[in-house]
């Protein structure tokens, strides 16, 4: 499974005007890889994630899955290929964790949303994979932020897509929960062969866990491994704008 961007322009378009957030973006993500999208506030990370998810139309260029543009898929076909986890809290506090995860099976259920044995098995496996099987009967509104985020990841896993996109999955979590979620996502990419792209502001954790980095700046999008990007000066240039420096030997970020 391959997700690719080809000369992609993202932003907003209406009858009166067009606002380009970022332009001429090119990148590719394959199965078994966890990539972290990083960039300054307001640079367009969420807009890019929404465009890759098909929630927002591109102004120009293409987003492709296995060489086919998103527009070539029906909504159902797209939901069978791409799972999405957004930052916003979903308005369903009275549903149990298990019921929330089961929503991930909607692309496969009948008109009435009836779960088959195979659907229930997919839900069970997703709950166990993220380590929250013991919370299945607890209301989603009564669990911690970290547990809730794991439930959202389990919902995406129950959807059984090859690509998972997550917008700020570690936002609002304490440090331990941030590390736990990032390790979980990397494990899922490596062991389940998922292509995982997540946006984050947690640079140090991203640098330590990501297989690849997508650095979004006004100059464009640069992608690659941390070491490769550092060798080309991309990491240093990116961090310098915020008064930071990357120390490669210690693999840490420090204030200048």
Regions inferred by a protein language model and the residue ranges of each:
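H-loop/switch region of ABC-family ATPase nucleotide-binding domains
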Residues: 200-201
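Helix-to-loop junction immediately C-terminal to a conserved catalytic motif
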Residues: 53
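ABC ATPase nucleotide-binding domains
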Residues: 239-256
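The feature captures the beta-strand-to-loop junction immediately N-terminal to the Walker
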Residues: 38-40
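Catalytic Walker B motif of ABC-type/P-loop ATPase nucleotide-binding domains
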Residues: 164-167
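Conserved ABC ATPase "signature" region
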Residues: 102, 117-135
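Conserved ABC transporter NBD signature motif
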Residues: 61-69, 78
């Amino acid at each position: 499974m391959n997700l690719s961007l080809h000369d992609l322009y993202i932003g907003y378009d209406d009858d009166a005007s067009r606002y380009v957030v970022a332009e001429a973006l090119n990148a590719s993500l394959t199965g078994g890889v966890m990539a972290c999208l990083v960039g300054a506030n307001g640079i367009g990370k969420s807009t890019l994630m929404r465009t890759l998810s098909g929630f927002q139309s591109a102004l120009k260029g293409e987003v492709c899955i296995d060489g086919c543009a998103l527009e070539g898929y029906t909504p159902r076909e797209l939901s069978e290929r791409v799972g999405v986890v957004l930052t916003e809290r979903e308005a369903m506090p009275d549903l149990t964790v298990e019921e929330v995860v089961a929503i991930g099976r909607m692309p496969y259920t009948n008109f009435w949303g009836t779960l088959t044995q195979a659907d229930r098995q997919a839900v069970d496996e997703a709950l166990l994979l993220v380590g929250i099987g013991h919370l299945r009967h607890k209301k989603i509104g009564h669990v911690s932020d970290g547990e809730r985020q794991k439930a959202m990841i389990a919902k995406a896993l129950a959807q059984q897509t090859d690509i998972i996109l997550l917008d700020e999955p570690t936002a609002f979590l304490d440090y331990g929960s941030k590390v736990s979620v990032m390790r979980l996502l990397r494990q899922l990419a490596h062991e389940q062969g998922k292509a995982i792209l997540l946006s984050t502001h947690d640079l140090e954790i991203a640098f330590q866990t990501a297989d690849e980095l997508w650095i979004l700046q006004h100059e464009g999008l640069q992608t690659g491994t941390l070491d490769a990007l550092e060798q080309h000066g991309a990491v240093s240039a990116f961090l310098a704008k915020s008064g930071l420096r990357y120390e490669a030997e210690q693999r840490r970020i420090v204030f200048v």
